[in-house]
């Protein structure tokens, strides 16, 4: 919206009212049409897949749009034109306020009022609210659901484009706008309450005021102030400020699964061949292949730790990097500050991360659905801010350097075998836990918490322990990662790292136990191969979209279906 507005206002005549405001509205309309096109071509095809797949597909769209914007407008920030007739300032209570700021202040309640009227006083709005509550019933009444949801997506995209376009006199346009606003938009919606437009407006006012005055009152907390507010709100009011308790109910992170069963014989043979190939890799491949293999193995363990709570537990975490980075920092600080060897420092990684997950999980498991996911994100951002600002311990943005394995394990081949052994052990332990009574109880709580509790299962406690074990597993991956890279930085606890794990799980398949390994391999190899090309974001985004559309059950889920089908005798039902 911002980029299009800069170009269209220039085209229409930036110095005239018609040129400026016409360019802003035209940019918003173009963005709305592009959003509707994305819904028709991409999202409509995966509505029956797990809901998080839609999030993954939109992430791919973001990568595509980033590279297209880079090609079209270049890497430099664009300065937007000033609004004609609004270049002065107004004095209010002795303070000078830009006139255009008053326009922005007035625009928000006007949009709020328009949306309220649209959703509460029109037939279309009633149908949208009805379809949100029960889509199948609305379809049974003869309403064209596809057209209805395309219109909703157009409206949302139009408003997003309008927001980007209307702010160009103040902020211009740059390539980092998308990721910079996504987290804030999520926070506002969750604090306000899912399904509450008024709640989102109220939350945006609160966050805006805190961001403005927080610099003066709590300068150390400016990095995570909105996440602190979100954490406090969700702990005391899990459905948001103006949301309803029924909106906090989970909508599911996975489709209905068949009962767990041992892997088919063909799959076990394929797994044995893969393990044999991994054991022979140092003798057959060069140093670069070993470095890449170590990264794939470490990220597979990281993704498996997230899958353990997402698949069997039904808990989608948006902040799992807190435990990956926490384990990495624990091992690095034990090595550099305490002088411990890898034999003592590496076990501290899962221990520290497990304790951190135990503390955060106590609050998180009381929530469900997107509220659970956003609270995990809030805690992860708090941990990330500590890593950035506690420079005396963590080194801040400079990180902790010089964390290398000792001579006896320093050879790359030897370290590869250590990583392979620990990752294989972690994956095997995770699989056995899922097939244990603990794992079945966890699945029971995911599928029906009320029934599980009626059977005497303490669902919250099972989920809490699973969350802690998952954090410990992620911490082990972080410890192995820091010794493979020789350093750790706050980026390992950031939002992009958490979303890397989420993408790997979804690409591999939430419903397949082998999904994290397949997803980690696919994502890492794709990123490594495409990052050497000029348009790597575009190609990676298209690859992610293609994989999501081709394998809505995930790569491993698709492979398991094929192997299971081929293993059936001819004529079997």
What are these regions (language model features)?
Residues 1-11, 37-53, 129, 186-198, ...:
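Single transmembrane alpha-helix segments in multi-pass membrane proteins
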Residues 2-6, 28-31, 60-63, 108, ...:
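Residue-level recognition of pore/gate-forming positions within transmembrane alpha-helices
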Residues 13-29, 150-236, 321, 346-347, ...:
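Transmembrane alpha-helical segments in multi-pass inner-membrane proteins
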Residues 14-23, 49-54, 85, 91-102, ...:
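Membrane-interfacial amphipathic/re-entrant helices at transmembrane-helix boundaries
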Residues 15-61, 68, 202-207, 234-238, ...:
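Alpha-helical transmembrane segments within multi-pass membrane transporters and channels
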Residues 41, 72, 76, 133-140, ...:
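Cytosolic-side transmembrane-helix boundaries in multi-pass membrane proteins
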Residues 46, 54-121, 148, 173, ...:
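Transmembrane helix-bundle core of multi-pass membrane transporters
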Residues 96-173, 197-202, 261-262, 412-489, ...:
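Helix-loop-helix "hairpin" substructures at the membrane interface of multi-pass membrane proteins
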